[in-house]
Curated annotation (Swiss-Prot):
GO molecular function: phosphatidylglycerol-prolipoprotein diacylglyceryl transferase activity
Purpose: Catalyzes the transfer of the diacylglyceryl group from phosphatidylglycerol to the sulfhydryl group of the N-terminal cysteine of a prolipoprotein, the first step in the formation of mature lipoproteins.
EC numbers: 2.5.1.145
Gene designation: lgt
Stretches that traverse the bilayer: 17-37, 59-79, 97-117, 230-250, 265-285
Organism of this sequence: Paraburkholderia xenovorans (strain LB400)
Protein name: Phosphatidylglycerol--prolipoprotein diacylglyceryl transferase
Membrane topology: Multi-pass membrane protein
Length: 301
């Protein structure tokens, strides 16, 4: 059984300024996106479409705005709408936390539509170019969550070699024991709690790094090395992320203010299902269009 390292959330102290790890991970995410994007410029079919390093820089500007605005508004609307409607000024307190990937995804999508309009490109051509740049950023964000010791997983069997004790979850663990006496007895969790005052949980942030970050990066990296029908790379991203997130949510602790929703699924799972379905539909449309219009259907990504 492992114990979370309980990192200091502040990475660097610069006089009165405190640079937090989570904020630093945003910087890492955008630097990684620049690196991956410039590597993609070396692909002959990408270069032939006229993409440049300046395009990447401009897209990231749009992407930063879409991520922050969409991520925050998505969290407000999807997760704590009643609270923020009652306390609207708290919406602007982003330093207190509260970002949603699905909201950020919608924000970035709208930002890329605007970028495509201004550059007179197809928006699917733009999202196909951007999609392989995203997983490294997702991994950085989840690493920030892990360093902060937040968004931990559900309680699990302490005999699992990956089971981890999260100090931040300790206030909820006594209530969990009272609510799940059978599992507590089966996994001998009362003894564990008596010794550590915490319960073992899935390190779900690390699962997300592995699936949404590493695995999805390599899937998109190899899939996009050669020309694909326009929309296909975006579709693979939607399907890949949706499946990864839907799967990890079974091990991730649901938000305490929402719990599990219909059919025993979490909010993250319900928001991921449309991504999977839209991705499948887009993939089918993409290849059917390529067969009908082979000369025009190849993506620039």
């Amino acid at each position: 059984m492992l114990i979370h390292p309980n990192f200091d959330p502040v990475a660097i102290h610069l006089g009165p300024l405190a640079v937090r790890w989570y904020g630093l991970m945003y910087l890492v995410a955008f630097i990684a996106a620049i690196v991956v994007g410039r590597l993609r410029l070396r692909l002959p079919y990408v270069a032939a479409q006229g993409w440049t390093a300046k395009d990447i820089d401009d897209m990231l500007f749009y992407g930063v705005l879409g991520t922050i605005l969409g991520g925050r508004l998505g969290y407000v609307l999807f997760y704590k709408a009643s609270f923020y409607f009652a306390h609207p000024l708290d919406i602007f307190k982003v330093w207190e936390g509260g970002m949603s990937f699905h909201g950020g995804f919608l924000g970035v999508t709208l930002a890329m539509v605007l970028f495509a309009y201004q550059r007179k490109r197809s928006w699917l051509q733009v999202t196909d170019f951007v999609a392989p740049m995203v997983p490294t950023g997702l991994a950085a964000g989840r690493l920030g969550n892990f360093i902060n010791g937040e968004l931990w997983g559900r309680v699990t069997d302490p005999s699992a070699p990956w089971a981890m004790l999260f100090p931040g979850a300790a206030p909820d663990d006594a209530a969990w024991l009272a609510a799940h006496p059978q599992l507590a007895a089966q996994w001998h969790l009362n003894e564990v709690f008596a010794q550590y005052h915490m319960l073992p949980r899935h390190p779900s942030e690390l699962y997300e790094i592995a699936l949404e970050g590493v695995a999805l990066f390599f899937v998109l990296f190899f899939f996009s090395r050669k020309p694909k029908p326009m929309g296909a790379i975006s579709a693979v991203f939607l399907i890949g992320y949706g499946l990864a997130r839907f799967t990890v949510e079974f091990a991730r602790e649901p938000d305490d203010f929402l719990g599990l929703l219909a059919m025993g699924l979490s909010m993250g799972q319900w928001l991921s299902l449309p991504m999977i379905l839209v991705g499948i539909g887009l993939l089918v449309w993409s290849y059917r269009r390529a067969r009908r219009e082979p000369a025009q259907a190849v993506s620039a990504s």
